Regions:
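Outer-membrane beta-barrel channels and translocator barrels
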Residues: 19, 60-62, 107-111, 174-176
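Residues on the lipid-exposed face of transmembrane beta-strands in outer-membrane beta-barrel proteins
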Residues: 26, 53-57, 100-104, 120-122, ...
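Extracellular loop and loop/strand-boundary signature of outer-membrane beta-barrel proteins
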Residues: 34-42, 83-91, 151-157
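Gram-negative (and chloroplast) outer-membrane scaffold detector with strong preference
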Residues: 63-145
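Predominantly the C-terminal beta-signal and adjacent terminal strand-loop region
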Residues: 176-218
Length: 218
């Protein structure tokens, strides 16, 4: 089973909310996806804006606890890939990601103006994959059960809320005593194989028609 990666490239601006410990962060950047419909970890042609906010609490001068919420979008379209153009599949999904974790800096920004850092944690995210039908109308894919989820053998209907493991790293700069700027690359290894609504195989068209109607077959 191929799991998905939710990749976020962030430019982060933390503002110190207190003189020593707590920082409020705001950030913007790009979100991307890797999975059954996209084998590259990052492709600018299918990247989307992402933004969010969070809190960073300094446990020590190098170790911090972080809590973020990120709003983004992931998608893939075979029309943009010469390799997969004949397959002609596509999807798009908004993603809301809430993450708790720890961040470790190699150096203290109280002593230096620059430090690399890494982070890891746990996140809970929501998604809702959709595609366009033959008339160009947006259709949400989960209710269609195109792989028989919910009615075929042991294929259970998947939840639109899942857990993931976030991890990554970046470089942080102390612009002043109260403002820090960070450039960060992060991934989310998801706990679902249905971020793009593709996992195993499609079921028989007649069986799909009987259970979910003509729209699912189309």
């Amino acid at each position: 089973m191929t799991h998905r990666f939710f990749l976020i490239l962030l430019s982060t601006i933390p503002f110190l909310a207190s003189a020593q410990k707590l920082q409020v962060t705001v950030f913007g950047g790009f979100s991307n996806y890797q999975g059954d419909l996209q084998d590259k970890r990052f492709t600018m042609s299918q990247a989307h804006p992402a933004f969010g906010a969070g809190l960073l609490y300094d446990i020590t001068d190098k170790l911090s606890a972080r809590a973020n919420i990120t709003l983004g979008k992931v998608s893939s379209d075979d029309k943009k890939s010469a390799k997969n153009a004949v397959r002609n599949l596509s999807f798009s999904s908004p993603v809301t990601d809430m993450h708790l974790g720890l961040e470790y800096s190699l150096f203290s920004l109280y002593e230096r103006s620059l430090t690399p850092y890494i982070f890891a944690g746990v996140s809970y995210f929501s998604f809702n994959p959709s595609a366009k039908d033959t008339a160009g109308n947006k259709v949400f894919l989960q209710p269609l059960s195109t792989e028989g989820q919910g009615f075929y053998q042991d294929r259970k209907k998947y939840s639109l809320n899942q857990f993931a493991i976030p991890f990554g790293g970046g470089v942080k700069f102390a612009l002043s005593e109260n403002i820090r700027l960070a450039f960060e690359i992060g991934m989310r290894k998801t706990n679902t194989d249905y971020l793009d609504d593709v996992s195993t195989t499609y079921v028989d068209e007649f069986l799909l028609f009987v259970n979910r109607g003509q729209q699912a077959v189309d």
